[in-house]
Swiss-Prot record:
<dbReference type="Pfam" id="PF12072">
    <property type="entry name" value="RNase_Y_N"/>
</dbReference>
<dbReference type="GO" id="GO:0003723">
    <property type="term" value="F:RNA binding"/>
</dbReference>
<comment type="similarity">
    <text>Belongs to the RNase Y family.</text>
</comment>
<protein>
    <recommendedName>
        <fullName>Ribonuclease Y</fullName>
        <ecNumber>3.1.-.-</ecNumber>
    </recommendedName>
</protein>
<dbReference type="InterPro" id="IPR004087">
    <property type="entry name" value="KH_dom"/>
</dbReference>
<dbReference type="InterPro" id="IPR036612">
    <property type="entry name" value="KH_dom_type_1_sf"/>
</dbReference>
<keyword id="KW-1133">Transmembrane helix</keyword>
<dbReference type="GO" id="GO:0004521">
    <property type="term" value="F:RNA endonuclease activity"/>
</dbReference>
<feature type="region of interest" description="Disordered">
    <location>
        <begin position="99"/>
        <end position="119"/>
    </location>
</feature>
<keyword id="KW-0255">Endonuclease</keyword>
<dbReference type="GO" id="GO:0006402">
    <property type="term" value="P:mRNA catabolic process"/>
</dbReference>
<keyword id="KW-0472">Membrane</keyword>
<dbReference type="InterPro" id="IPR004088">
    <property type="entry name" value="KH_dom_type_1"/>
</dbReference>
<feature type="region of interest" description="Disordered">
    <location>
        <begin position="50"/>
        <end position="82"/>
    </location>
</feature>
<keyword id="KW-0540">Nuclease</keyword>
<keyword id="KW-0812">Transmembrane</keyword>
<feature type="domain" description="HD">
    <location>
        <begin position="330"/>
        <end position="423"/>
    </location>
</feature>
Amino acid sequence: MNNTNKLIITIVCLVIIITIVEMYIRRKYAWAKISKAEEDAKKIKEDAKREAETLKKEATLEAKEEAHRLRSDLDKETRERRNEIQRLERRNLQREETLDKKNDLLEKRENGLNERENSIQERQNTIEQLYKEEREKLEQLSGLTSEEAKNLLLEEVNREIKHEKSIMIKEVEQKAKEEADKKAREIITYAIQRCAADHVAESTVYVVSLPNDEMKGRIIGREGRNIRAIETLTGVDLIIDDTPEAVILSGFDPVRREVAKVALEKLILDGRIHPARIEEMVEKAKKEVENNIKEEGEQATFETGVHGLHSELTRLLGRLKYRTSYGQNVLKHSIEVSYLAGFMAAELGIDPTFAKRAGLLHDIGKAVDHEVEGPHALIGAEVSKKYHELPLIVNAIGAHHGDVEPQSLEAILVQAADAISAARPGARRETLEAYIKRLEKLEEIANSYEGVEKSYAIQAGREIRIMVKPETVDDAGSIEMARGIVKKIEEQLEYPGQIKVNVIRETRAVEYAK
């Protein structure tokens, strides 16, 4: 037990000793660490102080360098400004010297001008005195006062100016007219050359071929009931005469005549001809003709490039295929007018769209004018207005025969194109005998005047050129003769459109060099 206690005491003593030793070692280590930290801090402080001194020296040096640089820049700028000021001073000094010289020169010129002015004034006084003396002498010699002489001179000058002005105006008007006529001829010629429309002249009758003459009896029917049915349903006269294998359809309305023709051809092809069958075929023919009318109208708009027409206007346009004017097919005529108006508009630098549209529709009134009273131009204008055509188009349609005043260049172009298409030789039919007689009568009227050497009726009788003897008829007589011939033509002849009377007087001077 005692040994155990001793061992415990020994262990406790050892633990205490070890603890004390450990504490001593730790304290010594802490003191060493603190001493080292103090040394490090002192060293850092010294380093910081040295670095601060270094930075201070560097900053001081940089500040001195910057101050030196700024002082140098300032000195440089000061020198430059001083030089600029000196340069400006020299320049101002030069300007002052120049101004002084100019002032001296101006003074000299002013003195010279004053001297010249005095000299001129003296001369003017002398001239006025001489003028006064001369005027008094002239008044004494002429017996006129200065005011009277002045008025007389002004009147003479006015007369001369008026005469020269009249001559100049006449020359300008003549030149303008010649140039305008030349340009108009070029435009019209170009338009006609580009337009080559085929015209088919139609009459008021159709001839329908028959397979044999026995068919005539079947068409007539028992007691004429078949022929009466055809005439009643179509409104067209059937003429059955001795013409072999043919019957003639005669009617004023070309659409009805076409319906009768189509119906009769169908009946002949079918072979069954009786009133009920006739009625059936007439109805089919009406539908077929109506379809053809619509197709013709659409084809016309396609050919001319006119789009956006109301369907009713297109139908009326197609009806014109079955209308003629002096033998000229109205639809073909309308297409030609559309082309001509478009070509002329393009030549004049105008958009041809409206001119072509108005030209195509200009005779649309002929498709309905047998149903409505009034001139076809005004009827066409009303119809086009009803179907919402532009006022420009409506006016061009109404004005193409002068029933209303044209309000646009397109309207005038449509008038011109209509006249060109109608006046073109061969476009409208006229009996040969009446044509020749009219030309002979024209030349006969011209040749009846004294002094006429020869005359020629040209351009299908629309112009007559008369060559007169210059020794018998003078210029004034030529004008009087032209008026007299025009009056006789108007009194003695009937003619479409107008006739131009052209009296030509030519004087030639011929000499021979020997």
